[in-house]
Design a protein with these regions (language model features):
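Short glycine-rich anion-binding loops that position phosphate/pyrophosphate groups of nucleotides
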Residues: 10, 76-79, 169, 201-202
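Feature captures the catalytic cores and cofactor-binding loops of soluble hydro-lyases/lyases
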Residues: 33-68, 82, 86-91, 181-258
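Conserved mixed alpha/beta catalytic, RNA-binding, or beta-rich assembly cores of soluble enzyme
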Residues: 21, 35, 93-97, 110-218
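General beta-strand structural signal in soluble alpha/beta enzymes
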Residues: 6-8, 30-31, 71-74, 96, ...
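Alpha-helical structural signal in soluble globular domains
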Residues: 20, 102, 106, 110, ...
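N-terminal glycine-rich phosphate/adenylate-binding segment common to multiple enzyme folds
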Residues: 56-121
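Short coil/turn connectors at secondary-structure junctions
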Residues: 1-3, 24-27, 45, 66-69, ...
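N-terminal basic/disordered segments at the start of proteins
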Residues: 2-33
């Protein structure tokens, strides 16, 4: 039986990966991050240990003890913890990608290859075009094009993946707070009918921090009465896709792959 190491952050992504991998005959050993990972993951995997997000050596020791040679990252760690946790010492101006590169290098040194985060879920990547019942209006399409350009630039500067726009005005750009709070912030300015655009980095490494949307994203969009969510086709993962689409259609949201 093949073994998979799972580095599990927050949200449903790690649970979906674990279930899918188990369904394909893998034995899954998960490294769960305190304060982030859903505790119910323990029921979905064969072995699990809890670590603080800065305890890289503990993660490596666990994978070595489990005989892991391939691993996958799923779910995020809230970025504000990098600054709030007193035990974490970061070099100035360090980027997400630099931190993750350290993890990749450390895994490689113990013989563990890091797979793409979408390895088991490639069929759930967003396709190009409208995949909701309601298509965007001409005005919404203008905002999608505008938001796409802004989001691509923001992602290239490691600022964030998501922007909120309305009538050609930028209402919010995702920063440290994450996607949900950025949507809420933009929605508070634009009120009903904002357009949300989520893009990958220009040279997105699919092993980590891939754009993800799920039912929780739709809940937040409904909360602020957004009208459109546009995501990068081929790079954005749709978690619990059927439930996500049903919720979007119920709310009259337009979902578009660009």
């Amino acid at each position: 039986m093949e073994r998979l190491g799972l580095i599990a952050g927050n949200g449903q992504f790690p649970l979906v990966v674990a279930r899918t991998a188990k369904g394909r005959g893998y034995s899954v050993a998960a490294c769960a991050i305190r304060g982030e990972t859903d505790p119910s993951l323990e029921k979905e995997v064969d072995a699990l240990t809890w670590v603080e997000f800065w305890e890289l050596e503990k993660l490596l020791d666990f994978f070595k003890s489990q005989g892991i040679h391939q691993a996958l990252m799923a779910g995020q760690v809230r970025k504000e913890r990098l600054f709030k946790e007193s035990r974490v010492q970061l070099p100035s101006r360090v980027a997400d990608q630099a931190l993750l590169a350290i993890v990749v290098k450390s895994l490689k040194e113990i013989g563990v290859r890091l797979l793409d985060s979408t390895y088991f879920l490639s069929s759930d990547l967003a396709q190009k075009g409208c995949f909701s019942k309601r298509a965007p209006t001409p005005e919404e399409r203008k905002d999608i094009a505008f938001g796409r350009d802004v989001a691509k630039r923001a992602a290239s500067f490691e600022i964030g993946q998501t922007v909120v726009v309305k009538q050609g005005v930028v209402l919010a750009i995702e920063a440290l707070e994450g996607t949900d709070q950025a949507i809420r912030r933009g929605g508070s300015f634009g009120r009903e009918g904002v357009v949300v655009v989520k893009m990958a980095r220009p040279r997105q490494d699919m092993r980590f921090d891939v754009p993800v949307i799920g039912p929780r994203t739709i809940e937040v969009l409904r909360e602020v009465r957004a009208s459109v969510l546009a995501v990068q086709a081929g790079k954005t993962l749709l978690i619990e896709k059927n439930r996500l689409l049903a919720s979007a259609d119920e709310a009259g949201l337009s979902l578009v792959g660009i």
